[in-house]
């Protein structure tokens, strides 16, 4: 919550009743078609400054993304190497890419995917 009582866009915080300090819950005013926050213990309600009541941010780890993108080994834009053979099938060629992870320890980690059609093994070094 900002000092002026408003909320940062995209941030959905817990709001509390100004009269009895209980939690406020989202409620629709069907007649005026607006979102309200209402107390379930007293009659206090306030108009919502934002129509968003829930934010679900999904972040994927690089390991998950290589599983989701099955064709990563066929991507012509990814660099290829023969210096890191597949540990699973022995195939010499692999595509590689750098992690875009927000974690500092993963900042320079390279991920490899075997280009053999029957394999698709993923690893990092």
UniProtKB/Swiss-Prot annotation:
- Location in the cell: Nucleus, Nucleolus
Which molecular function term from Gene Ontology is one that the record holds? DNA-directed RNA polymerase activity
InterPro entries in the cross-refs: DNA-dir_RNA_pol-M_15_CS, Rpa12/Rpb9/Rpc10/TFS, Zn_ribbon_RPB9, Zn_ribbon_RPB9_C, Znf_TFIIS
Residue numbers bearing the N-acetylmethionine modification: 1
Q: What is the superkingdom listed in this entry's lineage?
A: Eukaryota
Task: Tell me which UniProt keywords the record has, alphabetically.
Answer: Acetylation, DNA-directed RNA polymerase, Metal-binding, Nucleus, Transcription, Zinc, Zinc-finger
- Which cellular components does GO assign to this protein? nucleolus; nucleus; RNA polymerase II, core complex
- Which positions does UniProt annotate for Zn(2+) 1 binding? 17, 20, 39, 42
Give the similarity note.
Answer: Belongs to the archaeal RpoM/eukaryotic RPA12/RPB9/RPC11 RNA polymerase family.
Functionally, this protein is described as follows: DNA-dependent RNA polymerase catalyzes the transcription of DNA into RNA using the four ribonucleoside triphosphates as substrates. Component of RNA polymerase II which synthesizes mRNA precursors and many functional non-coding RNAs. Pol II is the central component of the basal RNA polymerase II transcription machinery. It is composed of mobile elements that move relative to each other. POLR2I/RPB9 is part of the upper jaw surrounding the central large cleft and thought to grab the incoming DNA template.
Protein name as annotated: DNA-directed RNA polymerase II subunit RPB9
From the broadest rank down, the organism's phylogenetic lineage runs: Eukaryota, Metazoa, Chordata, Craniata, Vertebrata
Q: Which gene does this sequence derive from?
A: POLR2I
């Amino acid at each position: 919550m900002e000092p002026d009582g408003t909320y940062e866009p995209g941030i959905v915080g817990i709001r509390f009743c100004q009269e009895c300090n209980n939690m406020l819950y989202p409620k629709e005013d069907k007649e005026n078609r607006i979102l309200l926050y209402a107390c379930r213990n007293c009659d206090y309600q306030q108009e919502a400054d934002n129509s968003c009541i829930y934010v679900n941010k999904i972040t994927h780890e690089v390991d998950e993304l290589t599983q989701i993108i099955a064709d990563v080994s066929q991507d012509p834009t990814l660099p290829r190497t023969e210096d890191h053979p597949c540990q699973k099938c022995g195939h010499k060629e692999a595509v590689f890419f750098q992690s875009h992870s927000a974690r500092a320890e993963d900042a320079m980690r390279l991920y490899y995917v075997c280009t053999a059609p029957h394999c698709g093994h993923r690893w990092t070094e």
